[in-house]
Every structure is written in C-alpha cells, then in structure tokens.
Amino acid sequence: MTRWGFGADLSIPLPVSRSVYPANDEPAQTAMAGIGQQSVRTTPLMMAMVAATVANDGEQMVPYLISQTLDADLQVVSTTKPTVARTPIDSQTAATLTGLMQQAVSSGTGTSAQVAGVSVAGKTGTAQTGSDDGGPITWFIGFAGTDINNPTIAVAVVLDGGEQIPTTGTGGSVAGPIAASVIDAAVDQ
C-alpha cells in the first residue's frame, strides 16, 4: 500500500493526517481490510487521490489547493505545475478499474451516484462500527466528467456513522447521493 502513498506525509497548506495501512498484516487481516473490517486508517483526501489515480491512467498527482495566484489587476502571478507523485498502477490496470467502477455506478451498488449527461465511475463502501449508537461508516469514491476518458473531478464522500445514519445505511444509499450532488455541481461549472 505504500506505493499508493499510505504512510507518506502530504505536503499541502492544511493539517492532514497520514493514511496508514498496517505493516506485516497476515493474509486474513488483509482480506478483512478489503471489506472495511480491520485497521486501515485513511482520509477522504487520500481516497480522492486513489480515485484520481485511476482516472489519471495510474499516475498519482501531488495534491494542491491553488492552481493560480492573481494580482490586483487579475494578472497571473504564479501557476501551480501539476506534478506526478508516484505511479502505483499501470495504465492497463487503471483502464480495467475504470470499467469496473463505471459498472458499479451504472448497474451496481453506486447507481445513486448517477448524474444525467455525466459519465461517473465509482465505488461504494460500508463498514460496521461495532456500536449500537448509530449506523455504519459509509463511503463513495469516484471520478466523473462529460467524457470518462477526460474526467474533471475526483470525489470522496464519507459519513462516519452516528445517529443520523440508519443502521441499514450503505455507501450507495447514503454517500452516493451526496457524491452525485457534488459531481453535478462541479461538472455543471
């Protein structure tokens, strides 16, 4: 998982927690982590970067907040140059994942993230918390654009259980509609 950036510090002008994947996990723990039932700790930013990496043919970019700085006369003072941080997967793997993520949204657990006129690829996630005080942790990560081969947005939506999430809530039923609203607003710009 280190090839995806887990365990690495992110250098952006905001406090950001490091996403971690436990070292030396046994195969059983690794399998459980794959369904959200182990000790993986990640942030929405990291998961948006994972989705963006798939969208970007396997290249993970260094995240940044400001693309351009303008002066008082609206002249460009500086421009951020996109930089590749790492390449955790090859373009063929990224293309396969893109197809699978498109299927998840078109006919799988992520149908609630569909947006009219927009191609959306995504993956839902649901993890029980082991608590009786609310619903599960629900996720949707994905990317979208009017052309899926040239996406314009990557998203990660997470709702951390609690009383407002029904105990039957899932990534598709809770996080997916929020992702659809974000994608619709961003692609509509």
Spans of features found by a protein language model:
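Short, gly/Ser/Thr-rich active-site loops of penicillin-recognizing serine hydrolases
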Residues: 76-83, 173-189
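Generic non-transmembrane alpha-helical segments
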Residues: 100, 165, 181-185
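A short acidic/glycine-rich loop-to-helix N-cap element
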Residues: 159-174
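Beta-lactam-recognizing serine transpeptidase/beta-lactamase-like catalytic domain environment
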Residues: 1-161
